[in-house]
Swiss-Prot record:
FAD binds at residues 53-56, 70-72, 77-78. This is Dihydroorotate dehydrogenase B (NAD(+)), electron transfer subunit. It is found in: Cytoplasm. It comes from Desulforamulus reducens (strain ATCC BAA-1160 / DSM 100696 / MI-1). GO terms for molecular function: 2 iron, 2 sulfur cluster binding; electron transfer activity; flavin adenine dinucleotide binding; metal ion binding; oxidoreductase activity. The lineage of its organism: Bacteria, Bacillati, Bacillota, Clostridia, Eubacteriales. It comes from the Bacteria. GO terms for cellular component: cytoplasm. It holds the Pfam family NAD_binding_1. Binds 1 FAD per subunit. Keywords: 2Fe-2S, Cytoplasm, Electron transport, FAD, Flavoprotein, Iron, Iron-sulfur, Metal-binding, Pyrimidine biosynthesis, Transport. Responsible for channeling the electrons from the oxidation of dihydroorotate from the FMN redox center in the PyrD type B subunit to the ultimate electron acceptor NAD(+). Together with PyrD, also forms a metal reductase complex able to reduce Fe(III)-chelates to Fe(II)-chelates, as well as soluble Cr(VI) and U(VI), using NADH as electron donor. To a lesser extent, can also use NADPH as an electron donor. Is unable to reduce riboflavin and FMN with NADH as electron donor. May have an in vivo role in metal reduction in D.reducens, which is an organism capable of reducing contaminant heavy metals and radionuclides.
Amino acid sequence: MSKVFDAKVLAVYMVAPNTYYMEFDAPDIARLAVPGQFVHVRCGETNDPLLRRPISIHMVSRPKGVLALLFRVVGKGTEILSQQKPGDRVNMMGPLGRGFTLPLPGSKVAVAAGGIGAAPLVFLVQELANIKCQVTVYLGARDKRSILCDGQFIQMEAEVVIATDDGSLGFKGTVPELMKRHMDWRKTAMTYVCGPGIMMKEISTMLAEADVPGEVSLEERMGCGVGACLSCAVKISHHGQISNKRACFEGPVFPSWQVVWE
Ligand SMILES: Cc1cc2nc3c(=O)[nH]c(=O)nc-3n(C[C@H](O)[C@H](O)[C@H](O)COP(=O)(O)OP(=O)(O)OC[C@H]3O[C@@H](n4cnc5c(N)ncnc54)[C@H](O)[C@@H]3O)c2cc1C
Ligand code: FES
């Protein structure tokens, strides 16, 4: 069950341009959370911004009761959040949403991360490593300074293959292009994707063509975060029937072949 509470900030670091890693004392979330879920964070003490902001659970340490977030500053809410200092308290609600489905232990899986989309995938790879999966991470960003979490993935013994738009590190091009060249689709039990919409759409199309399963984590604009306001509706196709699902409640993770990409 999700809760609302004030979490004490334990640490804040800027890890890349405009990108912050933040640790909180949050034992209930650390205990309950599964990869792919998110917290809904109140950014600041005043009513501006009024709405909470959804941020994925980046990592948890269950024994220490610690929750970590990794976020990019894009507007007012994330700007205020990035200014919090150790000892400050941040009101949050969570864990929320439906997370990733784990494969059978020992499976060979692919993880595709674009930009800040790497954030929730670190927690996922942590759990995949616990069940001894063989993980290849296809990790992309604009340039080498913007590559995130490569060290964490390597530490968890995942194979990491990098793509940058400008070719300053690894393959020059996009993550889907890299996967087309590198990935052995027939041997991959499951592919997990989080990143820009265009990247998730391209990879979902490739997965459908290769007839292999995948899951994507959708980043929709959210109001309430708990299924009440319908502001996060996404079109999902199930047995040919298209219906609206709430990204905050039935998602944010959906099977890649069910998403109706706009
Ligand atoms: C399930 C989920 C998980 C997310 N996880 C992360 C993460 O781990 N790290 C990270 O950097 N970002 C993440 N985001 C995106 C993050 O929520 C937005 O960047 C943030 O809400 C922007 O708020 P702002 O006040 O800084 O920007 P503003 O542009 O001022 O925000 C205005 C409004 O738009 C909403 N909004 C703006 N951009 C987005 C967006 N991309 N997705 C959803 N709502 C948006 C805000 O919640 C707010 O209501 C996630 C989004 C979702 C839906
Ligand atoms: S954000 Fe309100 S229903 Fe999803």
